[in-house]
């Protein structure tokens, strides 16, 4: 859905807009630093690289040091597709060294980071001295709020099922379930049963 939405938006996006006697022109932000997490690696990488390319930005990608292969393969694919040298750049390494160097580098104009809140704070602090834009998707593990009029069996068992998707490694897994106090005991039994029947 990310790519379909991006492609659809690009078809009608107004790069220039006349407002009275003024012309508003939207231009690429410049070099984008992209730091991606270990879970859903090719999806996370693509969701940062595709919009940057579409906007006309060059980029430096640092994939997670524990899941670097997808970034390497994408670099090979982009090279084979004829993306000019220097448009897509790949660096491997850890956050404290490579991530910090990217975030603080004066020639990187925007940082896009997906990962932990702890690391996000470090990215924002490192980027502050150069006053670059910072876009972050932090933390994860979403709340699953079940209201009084919900079908409790369906909501709880469905929520438990979603927790185990992608081996439980999804940042949007609804792992914090909030139910009405009066339904707590019943919800707990449904959750136990659903978890016990989950298939690896």
PLM features: what roles do these ranges have?
Residues 22, 89-112:
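A structured beta-alpha segment of the ubiquitous adenosine-cofactor-binding alpha/beta core
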Residues 71-80, 95-106, 118-129, 145-149:
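Active-site pre-lysine segment of PLP-dependent enzymes
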Residues 61, 90-92, 113-115, 134-138:
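General beta-strand structural signal in soluble alpha/beta enzymes
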Residues 1-49, 83, 88:
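N-terminal Rossmann NAD(P)-binding subdomain characteristic of aldehyde/semialdehyde dehydrogenases
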Residues 110, 118-200:
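ALDH superfamily catalytic-core signature
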Residues 9, 35, 94, 114, ...:
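Conserved residues at the C-terminal ends of beta-strands
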Residues 45-99:
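PLP-dependent aminotransferase-like
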């Amino acid at each position: 859905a990310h790519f379909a939405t991006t492609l659809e938006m690009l078809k009608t996006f107004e790069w220039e807009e006349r407002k009275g006697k003024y012309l508003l022109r939207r231009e690429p932000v410049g070099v984008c630093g992209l730091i991606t997490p270990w879970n859903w690696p090719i999806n996370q990488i693509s969701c940062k690289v595709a919009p940057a390319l579409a906007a006309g930005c060059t980029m430096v990608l640092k994939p997670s040091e524990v899941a670097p292969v997808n970034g390497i393969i994408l670099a090979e694919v982009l090279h084979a597709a004829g993306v000019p040298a220097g448009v897509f750049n790949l660096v491997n390494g850890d956050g404290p060294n490579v991530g910090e160097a990217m975030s603080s580098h004066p020639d990187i104009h925007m940082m896009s980071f997906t990962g932990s809140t702890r690391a996000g704070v470090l990215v924002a602090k490192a980027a502050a001295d150069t006053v670059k834009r910072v876009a972050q998707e932090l933390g994860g593990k979403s709340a699953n709020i079940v209201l009084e009029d919900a079908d409790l069996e369906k909501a709880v068992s469905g929520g438990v099922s979603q927790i185990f998707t992608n081996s439980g490694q999804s940042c949007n897994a609804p792992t914090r379930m909030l139910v009405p106090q009066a339904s707590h005991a019943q919800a707990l039994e449904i959750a136990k049963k659903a978890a016990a029947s989950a298939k690896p």
